[in-house]
């Protein structure tokens, strides 16, 4: 376990203790559920102030079953970093970054009346298709906003999608992660 602690220490030193965990993967794999559980078990218990704790709980993303895309844009959770102390007295200021993810076959929410749903984003002066915005936001989480990337995948056993539905989107995420070095 010694090497595990030195990894935390190395990250804490290089980032001045600020850790942004980018949670990426295809849509409808459980990214927001992962963030919700991480918040409940690691982040929220480390918040001392009851008002800050309540606000952090309110900032936790929603999660739901089904084929409907729930996340619509990248989101930093919690809004303010929370200090977590590891077993070896290494302190890290942690925030998670949620994203829409790359589109999977049979997901719903990116089309409206059989045409691409158009959205305005901070990255464009004009409306772009939701699917394109989701890809841009996911790439930004991977390349611009994360100290550590966590990829969430699914085998189709707990969703209304098949394993095959996820494969192309997973390959896109893997390609993006590998490109970061």
Set out the residue ranges of the language-model regions:
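Conserved G1/Walker A P-loop phosphate-binding module
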Residues: 1-127, 143-145
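Conserved C-terminal guanine-recognition region of P-loop GTPase G domains, centered on the G4
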Residues: 83, 87-89, 113-181
């Amino acid at each position: 376990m010694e090497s595990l602690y030195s990894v935390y220490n190395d990250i804490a030193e290089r980032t001045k203790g600020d850790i942004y965990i980018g949670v990426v993967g295809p849509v409808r794999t459980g990214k927001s559920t992962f963030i919700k559980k991480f918040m409940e078990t690691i982040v929220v218990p480390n918040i001392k102030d009851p008002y800050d704790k309540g606000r952090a709980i309110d900032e936790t993303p929603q999660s739901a079953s089904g084929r409907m895309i729930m996340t619509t844009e990248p989101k930093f959770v919690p809004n303010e970093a929370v200090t977590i102390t590891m077993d070896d007295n290494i302190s890290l200021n942690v925030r998670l970054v949620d994203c829409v993810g790359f589109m999977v076959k049979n997901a719903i929410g990116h089309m409206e009346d059989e045409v691409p749903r158009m959205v305005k984003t901070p990255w464009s002066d004009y409306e772009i298709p939701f699917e394109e915005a989701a890809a841009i936001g996911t790439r930004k989480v991977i390349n611009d906003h994360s100290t550590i990337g966590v990829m969430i995948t699914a085998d189709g056993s707990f969703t209304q999608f098949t394993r095959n539905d996820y494969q192309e989107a997973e390959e896109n995420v893997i390609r993006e992660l590998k490109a970061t070095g």
